[in-house]
A protein has these predicted regions:
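Long, basic/Gly/Ser/Thr-rich N-terminal segments
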Residues: 5-55
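Conserved ASCE/P-loop NTPase catalytic core
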Residues: 40-651
Length: 651
């Protein structure tokens, strides 16, 4: 290795070490330990409101601190930074989860219900819970997220539980906050045995939420129902300590290892909750409603925690079939977490998943490879609409916030509401990534084209033994739709732009000409020729030749033109230039117009069996431009050019 390489390696290592040091400084929280008297004197007065938060309020404050885009009134958030780099296209579900915590933190009845995330596999439920847990861990290391507990308490309870009920009214008058909760049996015994009832001497310390350390985060995964033991949730007698304390009813002889105790002051994750025994469910729902659990030999144990549960559709439908479960459903807040219905967001999911895989990092993907896979995935998740003229391809574009003729963006929410089950079934991201992985292992070129992706998906569908023949045929038909309605347009546009280097400027000039002609037509005035100075009427033939490229009818041309002028006026008032990106459908029309004008040139250059030297140079220049400007490599650029040549020969 060269000295330069060694130096660069050393510099990157030094930078990494510096980033670690900076991280520890940023996240190093001030540890604190003292008596309850010192806590009341030194710590509590600093921020009484924050230090008396319940678990729902704590999670809500963490979410707000993580950062969000404001969309209106205070605390009305749309997209939290906590989820920004991991979850894509499920903003509605994230909004409902945040609404749950906002309402619960305000003291509404919502806080007395269990939060259940319901959705298909690989839809983001587990990731959402993981991110919430990681957010809580980090938040607890900040001064804003400081948590204090009775030292040695098995449930990390608030030190304020030490204050007797007879004095809590005075506490409320002094500090302006209520104390909720009772001292746990373990600390009650310690108070008498170790401190002779003098609660002011009880030790208190700052705690930090940690899933690995079982502090503030508990997790329960279902076992075989025949062997599942409720002790996994609430603990059991520790026989090794019974001989020491002489009584199974002594709290010190109890094993406080249950998941509900680990989750105290934070969150309890219940994985596949509907698979657990009904007695487990009743215990959890009582805990959610009353903040108490009852175990043998002890009085009610107060626990302040938020239960985050998730399950899949199959288990949920099975659960619904049992009539005795209706009462349980009333005590849950169910948030649906569907697959995303935007192919652009779906492609972002694939980008995230493949970035962690070494064999993907070593393979070039053409610029549309992930997009064609994403469009296919979305098609499998959609339901046919009863609206006339709204096919699945148009739905795909609508849900990706693209313009579709005859449907305004304001109607999208209504269309979504007509088929609420969309996104709850269909292809999972995992299915697509597995298909891409197989395609990459077969590829010798270390390059994957969009057509190779479609073939890989075709193989995955045909070889899937779980799928019924009818579904296989439907999904194979979707691959044809992806190619015809989406990929063909994208790849032709790339080749066209690469062939005509001045395309962007020509398109902008054509846009300005269209706008001039439309404004003159709407104003009923003639246009002055800039060269001859003569006047002429607006060029209706030119206007229609552009509009027909996107199927604007004769009856619909006036409203389309008025819409274009209206958008141009908005851009003018905002001090911005009306460009191709200002109107997606007009952009498409102008591209198609230019493409038609140059079709013969393109066909001549790309389809010659024995190209002359000039044609070879043009082909080489097109391929080079596709590599340098449009995200292709040599292999995929050549394949794309050959594919477009085939398309042109068929037209």
């Amino acid at each position: 290795m060269s000295k330069a390489g060694v130096t660069e390696g050393n510099e990157s290592q030094i930078k990494f070490l510096e980033s670690l040091t900076a991280f520890t400084k940023e996240h190093r929280a001030r540890h604190w330990e003292g008596t309850f008297a010192a806590f009341l004197e030194d710590v509590l007065p600093r921020d009484t409101q924050r230090l008396t938060r319940n678990s729902h309020q704590y999670v809500w404050d963490m979410l707000r601190r993580s950062g969000a885009k404001e969309v209106g009134a205070q605390d009305q958030m749309s997209s939290y930074q906590l989820f920004a780099d991991e979850l894509f296209g499920i903003d509605d579900a994230l909004e409902r989860v945040s609404d749950y915590f906002k309402a619960a933190s305000a003291g509404s009845e919502v806080g007395r219900r269990l939060l259940l995330l319901l959705g298909p596999p690989s839809g983001g439920k587990s990731t959402m819970v993981i991110l919430l847990k990681r957010g809580l861990e980090e938040y607890s290391h900040t001064e804003e997220g400081a948590l204090y507990a009775i030292k040695g308490c098995p449930i990390k309870e608030s030190p304020l539980h030490l204050i007797p009920h007879t004095l809590r009214g005075t506490f409320r008058e002094t500090y302006g906050v209520e104390i909720s909760g009772e001292l746990c049996p373990y600390c009650r015994v310690r108070l008498e045995q170790e401190f002779a009832g003098d609660f002011m001497k009880f030790p208190v310390h700052r705690i930090f939420i940690s899933e690995a350390g079982r502090e503030g985060i508990g997790t329960y995964a279902p076992h075989d129902p025949a062997t599942a033991d409720i002790a996994d949730l609430v603990g059991s007698v520790d026989l090794s300590k019974v001989s020491k304390y002489g009584d199974e009813g002594d709290p010190r002889a109890w094993s406080w290892s249950g998941a509900v105790y680990a989750a105290s002051r934070g969150v309890l994750e219940m994985i596949e909750i509907l698979k657990v025994k009904r007695e487990f469910l009743y215990l959890l729902l009582t805990l959610t409603q009353e903040k108490n659990v009852k175990v043998s030999r002890f009085p009610l144990i107060y626990l302040d925690e938020t239960i985050l549960a998730h399950t899949n559709l199959a288990e949920f439908h099975k659960f619904l079939q049992e009539k005795e479960n209706e009462a349980l459903l009333d005590r849950m807040v169910i948030v649906r977490v569907p697959y995303t219905l935007s192919y652009k967001e779906e492609a972002r999911i694939y980008t995230k998943l493949i970035s962690a895989a070494p064999h993907f990092r070593e393979t070039h993907l053409d610029p549309h490879a992930l997009r064609v896979a994403a469009v296919f995935a979305i098609l499998t998740r959609l339901h046919k609409s009863e609206r006339e003229g709204l096919d699945l391809s148009k739905k795909v574009r609508l849900y990706a916030h693209e313009e579709v003729e005859g449907i305004s963006s304001s109607e999208v929410d209504r269309i979504r509401a007509e088929t609420p089950e969309e996104g709850m079934s269909g292809v999972s991201p995992r299915f697509v990534i597995n298909a891409l992985s197989k395609a990459i292992t077969r590829s010798e070129a270390r390059s994957l084209t969009s057509m190779e992706v479609l073939l890989a998906l075709k193989d995955a569908i045909e070889s899937d033994a779980r799928m019924e023949a009818k579904q296989k045929r439907q999904w194979l038909d979707f691959l044809v739709v992806v190619r015809k309605d989406f990929y063909n347009h994208w790849v032709k546009e790339d080749v066209h732009k690469a062939l005509f280097a001045s395309f962007e400027q020509e398109a902008q000039t054509l846009l300005e000409k269209y706008l001039d002609e439309v404004e003159a037509m709407l104003d009923h005035r003639e246009i002055v020729d800039p060269i001859t100075g003569e006047t002429r009427p607006p060029d209706e033939r030119f206007l229609r030749s552009v509009e027909e490229k996107i199927h604007i009818s004769e009856s619909g041309k006036l409203s389309f033109r008025q819409e274009v002028v209206r958008k141009a006026m908005v851009a003018y008032k905002q001090g911005t230039k009306f460009s191709l990106d200002s109107h997606a459908r007009l952009h498409e029309a102008i591209e198609q117009y230019l493409f038609e004008e140059r079709r013969d040139v393109l066909r001549l250059v790309t389809s010659s069996k024995r190209p002359d030297e000039e044609a070879k140079q043009k082909i080489s220049a097109v391929q080079r431009r596709m590599v340098e400007e449009y995200g292709y490599d040599e292999h995929s650029a050549k394949e794309a050019l050959n594919y477009v040549t085939t398309l042109l020969s068929q037209e």
